[in-house]
Protein backbone atom coordinates (compact mmCIF):
# COMPACT_ATOMS: atom_id res chain seq x y z
CA UNK A 1 0.00 0.00 0.00
CA UNK A 2 1.23 3.49 -0.87
CA UNK A 3 2.38 5.33 2.25
CA UNK A 4 2.24 9.10 2.63
CA UNK A 5 4.09 11.02 5.31
CA UNK A 6 1.51 13.67 6.20
CA UNK A 7 3.82 16.30 7.67
CA UNK A 8 1.94 18.82 9.80
CA UNK A 9 3.26 21.66 11.93
CA UNK A 10 2.83 21.44 15.69
CA UNK A 11 3.63 25.13 16.19
CA UNK A 12 1.06 27.14 18.10
CA UNK A 13 2.75 30.52 18.06
CA UNK A 14 4.86 32.60 15.70
CA UNK A 15 6.92 35.71 16.36
CA UNK A 16 6.00 38.84 14.43
CA UNK A 17 8.50 41.38 13.12
CA UNK A 18 8.09 43.53 16.24
CA UNK A 19 8.86 40.58 18.49
CA UNK A 20 5.32 39.97 19.72
CA UNK A 21 3.84 36.45 19.71
CA UNK A 22 0.93 35.60 17.42
CA UNK A 23 -1.19 32.40 17.36
CA UNK A 24 -0.57 30.07 14.45
CA UNK A 25 -0.84 26.41 13.42
CA UNK A 26 -2.16 24.56 10.37
CA UNK A 27 -5.04 25.68 8.13
CA UNK A 28 -8.02 23.39 8.69
CA UNK A 29 -9.24 23.06 5.10
CA UNK A 30 -5.71 22.52 3.80
CA UNK A 31 -5.18 19.75 6.34
CA UNK A 32 -8.54 18.00 6.09
CA UNK A 33 -9.40 17.88 2.39
CA UNK A 34 -6.13 16.30 1.16
CA UNK A 35 -6.16 13.85 4.07
CA UNK A 36 -9.66 12.70 3.17
CA UNK A 37 -8.79 12.48 -0.53
CA UNK A 38 -5.69 10.39 0.14
CA UNK A 39 -7.57 8.00 2.41
CA UNK A 40 -10.35 7.67 -0.16
CA UNK A 41 -7.70 6.85 -2.79
CA UNK A 42 -6.58 3.91 -0.66
CA UNK A 43 -3.32 5.39 0.62
CA UNK A 44 -1.88 4.73 4.07
CA UNK A 45 -1.59 8.22 5.57
CA UNK A 46 0.68 8.69 8.59
CA UNK A 47 0.29 12.02 10.38
CA UNK A 48 3.70 13.29 11.49
CA UNK A 49 4.74 16.36 13.45
CA UNK A 50 8.33 17.39 14.19
CA UNK A 51 8.15 16.55 17.89
CA UNK A 52 5.14 14.24 18.13
CA UNK A 53 2.99 16.93 19.72
CA UNK A 54 -0.58 17.16 18.38
CA UNK A 55 -1.01 19.74 15.63
CA UNK A 56 -3.04 22.86 16.35
CA UNK A 57 -5.55 24.52 14.02
CA UNK A 58 -4.66 28.14 13.30
CA UNK A 59 -7.57 30.23 14.67
CA UNK A 60 -7.34 32.53 11.64
CA UNK A 61 -7.70 29.53 9.35
CA UNK A 62 -10.98 28.69 11.07
CA UNK A 63 -12.47 32.03 10.01
CA UNK A 64 -15.78 31.47 8.23
CA UNK A 65 -14.61 33.02 4.97
CA UNK A 66 -12.07 30.22 4.44
CA UNK A 67 -14.85 27.65 4.54
CA UNK A 68 -17.41 28.51 1.89
CA UNK A 69 -19.47 25.47 0.87
CA UNK A 70 -18.11 24.09 -2.40
CA UNK A 71 -21.20 25.02 -4.44
CA UNK A 72 -20.97 28.65 -3.30
CA UNK A 73 -17.22 28.79 -3.87
CA UNK A 74 -17.42 27.32 -7.36
CA UNK A 75 -20.27 29.61 -8.39
CA UNK A 76 -18.42 32.69 -7.11
CA UNK A 77 -15.36 31.68 -9.12
CA UNK A 78 -17.50 31.36 -12.25
CA UNK A 79 -18.98 34.81 -11.63
CA UNK A 80 -15.60 36.47 -11.12
CA UNK A 81 -14.33 34.96 -14.36
CA UNK A 82 -17.03 36.83 -16.29
CA UNK A 83 -15.56 40.21 -15.45
CA UNK A 84 -11.96 39.49 -14.48
CA UNK A 85 -10.55 38.45 -17.83
CA UNK A 86 -7.74 40.94 -17.28
CA UNK A 87 -6.46 40.32 -13.78
CA UNK A 88 -4.48 43.55 -13.89
CA UNK A 89 -7.73 45.42 -14.49
CA UNK A 90 -9.66 43.87 -11.59
CA UNK A 91 -7.36 42.80 -8.79
CA UNK A 92 -8.45 39.80 -6.76
CA UNK A 93 -8.21 40.51 -3.05
CA UNK A 94 -9.20 38.68 0.10
CA UNK A 95 -11.31 41.69 1.12
CA UNK A 96 -13.41 41.52 -2.03
CA UNK A 97 -13.74 37.76 -1.80
CA UNK A 98 -14.86 37.78 1.82
CA UNK A 99 -16.36 41.08 2.94
CA UNK A 100 -18.82 42.16 0.24
CA UNK A 101 -21.28 39.28 0.44
CA UNK A 102 -20.31 37.97 -2.99
CA UNK A 103 -20.10 34.36 -1.83
CA UNK A 104 -23.92 34.38 -1.72
CA UNK A 105 -24.13 34.89 -5.49
CA UNK A 106 -25.37 31.34 -6.16
CA UNK A 107 -28.07 31.57 -3.52
CA UNK A 108 -29.24 34.96 -4.75
CA UNK A 109 -29.42 33.63 -8.31
CA UNK A 110 -31.65 30.80 -7.07
CA UNK A 111 -33.79 33.36 -5.23
CA UNK A 112 -34.23 35.30 -8.47
CA UNK A 113 -35.21 32.09 -10.25
CA UNK A 114 -37.86 31.47 -7.60
CA UNK A 115 -39.14 34.96 -8.36
CA UNK A 116 -39.77 33.90 -11.96
CA UNK A 117 -36.55 34.73 -13.79
CA UNK A 118 -34.84 32.19 -16.01
CA UNK A 119 -31.55 30.73 -14.84
CA UNK A 120 -29.68 32.61 -17.58
CA UNK A 121 -31.34 35.93 -16.70
CA UNK A 122 -30.72 35.43 -12.98
CA UNK A 123 -27.06 34.77 -13.68
CA UNK A 124 -26.73 37.90 -15.84
CA UNK A 125 -28.29 40.03 -13.09
CA UNK A 126 -26.03 38.54 -10.42
CA UNK A 127 -22.87 38.91 -12.51
CA UNK A 128 -23.61 42.56 -13.29
CA UNK A 129 -24.18 43.39 -9.62
CA UNK A 130 -21.09 41.45 -8.56
CA UNK A 131 -18.93 43.34 -11.03
CA UNK A 132 -20.14 46.70 -9.71
CA UNK A 133 -19.74 45.63 -6.09
CA UNK A 134 -16.21 44.40 -6.83
CA UNK A 135 -15.13 47.52 -8.71
CA UNK A 136 -16.71 50.02 -6.31
CA UNK A 137 -16.03 48.09 -3.07
CA UNK A 138 -19.72 48.05 -2.11
CA UNK A 139 -22.01 45.45 -0.60
CA UNK A 140 -23.38 43.02 -3.17
CA UNK A 141 -26.90 43.06 -1.69
CA UNK A 142 -27.07 46.86 -1.85
CA UNK A 143 -25.88 47.03 -5.45
CA UNK A 144 -28.27 44.31 -6.58
CA UNK A 145 -31.22 46.01 -4.90
CA UNK A 146 -30.36 49.27 -6.64
CA UNK A 147 -29.91 47.58 -10.01
CA UNK A 148 -33.31 45.92 -9.69
CA UNK A 149 -34.96 49.13 -8.46
CA UNK A 150 -36.45 47.31 -5.50
CA UNK A 151 -39.06 49.20 -3.53
CA UNK A 152 -39.00 49.29 0.27
CA UNK A 153 -42.55 47.94 0.45
CA UNK A 154 -41.74 44.80 -1.52
CA UNK A 155 -44.22 45.74 -4.21
CA UNK A 156 -41.92 44.24 -6.84
CA UNK A 157 -42.07 40.87 -5.14
CA UNK A 158 -38.54 41.06 -3.77
CA UNK A 159 -36.82 43.18 -1.11
CA UNK A 160 -33.25 43.99 -0.20
CA UNK A 161 -33.89 42.21 3.10
CA UNK A 162 -34.57 38.97 1.25
CA UNK A 163 -31.29 39.32 -0.62
CA UNK A 164 -29.44 40.10 2.60
CA UNK A 165 -31.02 37.04 4.21
CA UNK A 166 -29.32 34.88 1.57
CA UNK A 167 -25.99 36.59 2.34
CA UNK A 168 -26.48 35.96 6.05
CA UNK A 169 -27.47 32.34 5.48
CA UNK A 170 -24.35 31.75 3.39
CA UNK A 171 -22.18 33.08 6.20
CA UNK A 172 -23.97 30.94 8.78
CA UNK A 173 -23.42 27.83 6.66
CA UNK A 174 -19.74 28.71 6.27
CA UNK A 175 -19.38 29.11 10.02
CA UNK A 176 -20.99 25.71 10.56
CA UNK A 177 -18.69 24.14 8.01
CA UNK A 178 -15.61 25.61 9.70
CA UNK A 179 -16.72 24.17 13.05
CA UNK A 180 -17.51 20.82 11.44
CA UNK A 181 -14.07 20.61 9.84
CA UNK A 182 -12.40 21.39 13.14
CA UNK A 183 -14.39 18.64 14.87
CA UNK A 184 -13.55 16.16 12.12
CA UNK A 185 -9.83 16.89 12.37
CA UNK A 186 -9.89 16.44 16.13
CA UNK A 187 -11.46 13.01 15.66
CA UNK A 188 -8.71 11.73 13.35
CA UNK A 189 -6.43 9.51 15.48
CA UNK A 190 -3.29 10.76 13.74
CA UNK A 191 -4.09 14.36 14.63
CA UNK A 192 -4.55 13.34 18.27
CA UNK A 193 -1.47 11.11 18.45
CA UNK A 194 0.91 11.94 15.60
CA UNK A 195 4.23 10.24 14.99
CA UNK A 196 7.31 12.25 15.97
CA UNK A 197 9.50 12.85 12.92
CA UNK A 198 12.51 13.06 15.22
CA UNK A 199 11.91 9.45 16.29
CA UNK A 200 12.05 7.97 12.77
CA UNK A 201 15.17 6.19 11.59
CA UNK A 202 16.55 6.32 8.06
CA UNK A 203 14.95 2.91 7.48
CA UNK A 204 11.60 4.28 8.69
CA UNK A 205 11.84 7.23 6.32
CA UNK A 206 12.58 4.87 3.46
CA UNK A 207 9.18 3.25 3.88
CA UNK A 208 7.31 6.38 2.75
CA UNK A 209 6.37 6.82 -0.88
CA UNK A 210 5.62 10.55 -0.65
CA UNK A 211 5.33 13.49 1.70
CA UNK A 212 2.57 16.09 1.83
CA UNK A 213 2.70 19.25 3.94
CA UNK A 214 -0.42 21.41 4.38
CA UNK A 215 -0.10 25.08 5.17
CA UNK A 216 -0.94 27.65 7.76
CA UNK A 217 1.88 29.87 9.01
CA UNK A 218 3.00 27.11 11.39
CA UNK A 219 5.39 25.42 8.90
CA UNK A 220 7.42 28.64 8.82
CA UNK A 221 8.05 28.15 12.54
CA UNK A 222 9.02 24.50 12.96
CA UNK A 223 9.41 22.97 9.49
CA UNK A 224 11.53 25.55 7.63
CA UNK A 225 14.83 24.96 9.46
CA UNK A 226 14.56 21.42 10.75
CA UNK A 227 17.27 18.75 10.27
CA UNK A 228 14.72 15.94 10.56
CA UNK A 229 12.64 17.46 7.78
CA UNK A 230 15.87 17.62 5.80
CA UNK A 231 16.42 13.90 6.40
CA UNK A 232 12.93 13.08 5.14
CA UNK A 233 13.31 15.22 2.02
CA UNK A 234 16.72 13.74 1.26
CA UNK A 235 15.38 10.20 1.55
CA UNK A 236 12.48 10.91 -0.79
CA UNK A 237 14.48 12.97 -3.27
CA UNK A 238 17.03 10.16 -3.63
CA UNK A 239 14.20 8.03 -5.05
CA UNK A 240 12.54 10.93 -6.87
CA UNK A 241 9.46 10.20 -4.79
CA UNK A 242 6.67 12.80 -4.78
CA UNK A 243 7.29 15.76 -2.48
CA UNK A 244 4.18 17.92 -2.15
CA UNK A 245 3.37 21.03 -0.17
CA UNK A 246 0.53 23.55 -0.10
CA UNK A 247 0.34 27.29 0.62
CA UNK A 248 2.90 27.84 3.45
CA UNK A 249 3.74 24.14 3.40
CA UNK A 250 6.59 24.68 0.88
CA UNK A 251 8.50 26.12 3.84
CA UNK A 252 9.57 22.50 4.39
CA UNK A 253 11.77 22.80 1.29
CA UNK A 254 13.97 25.32 3.10
CA UNK A 255 15.06 22.49 5.40
CA UNK A 256 16.55 20.59 2.47
CA UNK A 257 20.36 20.32 2.55
CA UNK A 258 22.79 21.21 -0.21
CA UNK A 259 23.63 18.81 -3.01
CA UNK A 260 27.14 17.56 -3.64
CA UNK A 261 27.73 20.56 -5.92
CA UNK A 262 26.95 22.97 -3.09
CA UNK A 263 23.57 24.04 -4.43
CA UNK A 264 20.23 23.68 -2.65
CA UNK A 265 18.57 20.30 -3.14
CA UNK A 266 15.74 21.96 -5.10
CA UNK A 267 17.82 24.56 -6.92
CA UNK A 268 16.29 25.30 -10.31
CA UNK A 269 12.97 23.61 -9.56
CA UNK A 270 9.80 25.43 -10.58
CA UNK A 271 7.55 25.85 -7.57
CA UNK A 272 4.94 28.07 -6.00
CA UNK A 273 3.77 29.01 -2.52
CA UNK A 274 1.71 31.64 -0.75
CA UNK A 275 2.88 34.92 -2.28
CA UNK A 276 3.89 38.19 -0.69
CA UNK A 277 0.87 39.85 -2.36
CA UNK A 278 -1.43 37.37 -0.63
CA UNK A 279 0.51 37.62 2.62
CA UNK A 280 0.00 41.38 2.73
CA UNK A 281 -3.76 40.73 2.97
CA UNK A 282 -3.64 38.26 5.87
CA UNK A 283 -3.89 39.07 9.54
CA UNK A 284 -0.26 38.14 10.25
CA UNK A 285 0.93 39.90 7.12
CA UNK A 286 -0.77 43.15 8.07
CA UNK A 287 0.77 42.97 11.53
CA UNK A 288 4.21 42.39 10.03
CA UNK A 289 6.08 39.10 9.67
CA UNK A 290 9.74 38.35 10.26
CA UNK A 291 10.16 36.93 6.75
CA UNK A 292 8.18 36.05 3.64
CA UNK A 293 8.07 32.55 2.23
CA UNK A 294 8.14 33.32 -1.47
CA UNK A 295 11.16 35.58 -1.02
CA UNK A 296 12.99 32.89 0.95
CA UNK A 297 12.30 30.26 -1.71
CA UNK A 298 13.52 32.55 -4.49
CA UNK A 299 16.67 33.34 -2.52
CA UNK A 300 17.28 29.63 -1.97
CA UNK A 301 17.25 28.95 -5.72
CA UNK A 302 13.63 28.33 -6.66
CA UNK A 303 12.24 29.25 -10.06
CA UNK A 304 9.14 30.83 -8.59
CA UNK A 305 5.91 30.37 -10.56
CA UNK A 306 2.88 32.11 -9.09
CA UNK A 307 -0.56 32.28 -10.61
CA UNK A 308 -1.80 35.16 -12.77
CA UNK A 309 -3.58 36.64 -9.75
CA UNK A 310 -3.79 36.24 -5.99
CA UNK A 311 -6.16 33.76 -4.36
CA UNK A 312 -6.89 31.68 -7.45
CA UNK A 313 -6.04 27.99 -7.69
CA UNK A 314 -2.52 27.43 -9.00
CA UNK A 315 -0.49 24.21 -8.86
CA UNK A 316 3.03 23.67 -10.16
CA UNK A 317 4.43 20.22 -10.92
CA UNK A 318 8.15 19.98 -11.70
CA UNK A 319 9.54 16.45 -11.82
CA UNK A 320 8.67 14.93 -8.44
CA UNK A 321 7.90 18.26 -6.74
CA UNK A 322 4.26 19.35 -6.41
CA UNK A 323 3.37 22.72 -4.90
CA UNK A 324 0.09 24.63 -4.49
CA UNK A 325 -0.08 28.39 -4.07
CA UNK A 326 -2.88 29.10 -1.60
CA UNK A 327 -5.97 27.70 0.18
CA UNK A 328 -7.87 27.84 -3.10
CA UNK A 329 -5.37 25.34 -4.52
CA UNK A 330 -6.10 22.69 -1.88
CA UNK A 331 -8.10 20.20 -3.93
CA UNK A 332 -6.04 20.60 -7.10
CA UNK A 333 -2.81 20.01 -5.18
CA UNK A 334 -4.16 16.87 -3.53
CA UNK A 335 -5.42 15.59 -6.88
CA UNK A 336 -1.99 16.18 -8.45
CA UNK A 337 -0.43 14.03 -5.72
CA UNK A 338 -2.96 11.25 -6.30
CA UNK A 339 -2.32 11.39 -10.04
CA UNK A 340 1.43 11.17 -9.51
CA UNK A 341 1.17 8.27 -7.08
CA UNK A 342 -1.37 6.44 -9.21
CA UNK A 343 0.60 6.64 -12.46
CA UNK A 344 1.63 3.22 -13.82
CA UNK A 345 5.22 4.41 -13.96
CA UNK A 346 6.11 7.42 -11.85
CA UNK A 347 7.74 10.13 -13.86
CA UNK A 348 11.00 11.42 -12.40
CA UNK A 349 11.61 13.88 -15.19
Residue ranges and their predicted role:
Residues 88, 96-167:
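Catalytic-core signal marking the mid-to-C-terminal active-site face
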Residues 247-249:
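Catalytic nucleophile serine of serine hydrolases
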Residues 242:
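Active-site cofactor/cluster-binding pocket
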Amino acid sequence: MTRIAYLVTSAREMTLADGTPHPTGYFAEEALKPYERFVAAGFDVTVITPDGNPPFADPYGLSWFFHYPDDDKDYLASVVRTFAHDVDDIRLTLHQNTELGLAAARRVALLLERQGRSAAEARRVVCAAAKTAWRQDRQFATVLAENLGLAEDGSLGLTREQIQAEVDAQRADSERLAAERQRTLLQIPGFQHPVALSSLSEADLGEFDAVFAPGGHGPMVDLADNPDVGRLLTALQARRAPIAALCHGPAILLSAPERADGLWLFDGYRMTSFTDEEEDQTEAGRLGMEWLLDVALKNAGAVFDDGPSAWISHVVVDRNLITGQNPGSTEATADAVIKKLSAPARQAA
